[in-house]
Swiss-Prot record:
Biased composition range(s): Polar residues: 427-437
Protein name: Fez family zinc finger protein 1
Keyword Zinc included in the entry's annotation: yes
UniProt KW Transcription keyword: yes
Organism: Mus musculus
GO biological process, alphabetically ordered: axon guidance; cell dedifferentiation; central nervous system neuron differentiation; forebrain anterior/posterior pattern specification; forebrain development; interneuron migration; negative regulation of cell population proliferation; negative regulation of transcription by RNA polymerase II
Regions annotated as coiled coil: none
Biased composition (Pro residues): 439-466
Gene label: Fezf1
Location(s), subcellular: Nucleus
Length: 475
């Protein structure tokens, strides 16, 4: 047998209990539960505020809480001072300790009424009169950074604690569900109808006031209610407790600005990238050029949409008239024509439009200002595309040619009107619902049959004496 196995067997026999007649010598254990528990360090806790020191009467915490065991309450807030004069947050660092000034509690009048928390939270914490009302001027404090704090150092706080966070001014004595210790963790003044935060261990439950009334113990809630409150707490914490970092950073002098303004037109953007995309509107730069037709665009996305025109693909087809389009957005706009839907209405004349672009161009006609002027003949126009078509008259550029007669036009609209009026009528062509010409002859209207003519009557000579020649011949 190996020596290592022999040593292990010897140790096992030495520590094993006596069985039957076999006697073994017991050795003292190298560890003990008492020594392990004695070496367990106590959790570090924040010092108790001086206005709470001595306010808790001596006694058994378990008896005051009516609990069989003391469960530490974990509150995810740390009290941090906020100096209203210098607007500088204090988190306990040495250079900023000077602005953390907790005023001393005023003298308690002998006849002042006592405020006891034993009926609310069973923590046996009592404050008297003005001390309970003015123990902490909440307007001078503001929450800067949340942190999980083991507040077992507060005497007999127990497993149940209510945190109150509101938006309006209210003294702790004016609302029955406000705890003076919890007020120390507030970030804003209290409200007469506040939201209640139920904290038990590391689980934070944020129910609404109407769903969980004040004074309800944690043990009285069902498991379904707790799960429901836990789900609701996630959104509320992210919105309201997650915690004013934007407000705090906005007040910092070193915070980066979140507003970017165009120096030319004054338009505001929330990102520098959007401002960069906007600047070509003023500079006229069109860095994105189509390789097929050479047309330039300010944005790459506009160029991508333009490339579909050259593919001659029109996958989006109208179900009513059969007309096809390159983009689905164009089809959606086209369907407004069949539905008679004109969402863009002119404020001046009441005329409606299917498209927003046509609506904007129409409004320029009411302004009376023609800011687009021709450099050659000084003719002015309301809209820029009218000036573009007008420039073709000076350079004799007519890109749209009639395939029948060869006549050129500056606009495609004029070409279609020319074909519809001249060639379709002369060739007997009609337009189908899709807009394509058809060789079928146009239907002829049925005319009523002509009225019957009256019968012809023979014409007789008028009565009178016959001529002499005719009279003699008969004789």
């Amino acid at each position: 047998m190996d020596s290592s196995c022999l040593n292990a067997t010897t140790k096992m026999l030495a520590t094993a209990p006596a069985r039957g007649n076999v006697m073994s010598t017991s050795k003292p254990l190298a560890f003990s539960i008492e020594r392990i528990m004695a070496r367990t360090p106590e959790p570090k806790a924040l010092p108790v505020p001086h206005f709470l020191q001595g306010a808790v009467p001596k006694g058994d915490p378990k008896h005051s809480l009516h609990l069989n065991s003391s469960i530490p309450c974990m509150i995810p807030f740390v009290p941090v001072a906020y100096d209203t004069n210098s607007k500088a947050g204090v988190n306990g660092s040495e250079p900023r300790k000077a602005s953390l000034e907790v005023p001393a509690p005023p003298a308690v009048a002998p006849s002042a009424p006592a405020f006891s928390c034993s009926d609310l939270l069973n923590c046996a914490l009592s404050l008297k009169g003005d001390l309970a009302r003015d123990a902490l001027p909440l307007q001078q404090y503001k929450l800067v950074r949340p942190r999980v704090v083991n507040h077992s150092s507060f005497h007999a706080m127990g497993a149940l604690c209510y945190l109150n966070r509101g938006d309006g001014p209210c003294h702790p004595a004016a609302s029955v569900n406000i705890h003076p210790v919890a007020s120390y963790f507030l970030s804003s003044p209290l409200h007469p109808q506040p939201k209640t935060y139920l904290a038990e261990r590391n689980k934070l439950v944020v129910p609404a006031v109407e769903k969980l009334p004040s004074g309800v113990a944690f043990k009285d809630l069902s498991q379904a209610q707790l799960q429901h409150y836990m789900k609701e707490s996630a959104q509320l914490l992210s919105e309201k407790i997650a915690f004013k970092t934007s407000d705090f950073s906005r007040g910092s002098p070193n915070a980066k600005p979140k507003v970017f303004t165009c120096e030319v037109c004054g338009k505001v953007f929330n990102a520098h990238y959007n401002l960069t995309r906007h600047m070509p509107v003023h500079t006229g730069a069109r860095p994105f050029v189509c390789k097929v037709c050479g047309k330039g665009f300010r944005q790459a996305s506009t160029l991508c949409r333009h490339k579909i025109i050259h593919t001659q693909e029109k996958p989006h087809k109208c179900n009513q008239c059969g007309k096809a389009f390159n983009r689905s957005s164009t089809l959606n706009t086209h369907t407004r024509i069949h539905a008679g839907y004109k969402p863009f209405v002119c404020e001046f004349c009441g005329k409606g439009f299917h498209q927003k672009g046509n609506y904007k161009n129409h409004k320029l006609t009411h302004s009376g200002e023609k800011q687009f002027k021709c450099n050659i003949c000084n003719k002015a126009f309301h809209q820029v595309y009218n000036l573009t078509f007008h420039m073709h008259t000076h350079n004799d550029k007519k890109p749209f040619t009639c395939p029948t007669c060869g006549k050129g036009f500056c606009r495609n609209f004029d070409l279609k009107k020319h074909v519809r009026k001249l060639h379709d009528s002369s060739l007997g062509l009609t337009r189908t619902p899709t807009g394509e010409p058809s060789s079928d002859p146009p239907p002829q209207l049925q005319q009523p049959p002509p009225a019957p003519l009256p019968p012809l009557q023979p014409t007789l000579p008028p009565p009178g004496p016959l001529p002499s020649g005719l009279h003699q011949g008969h004789q």
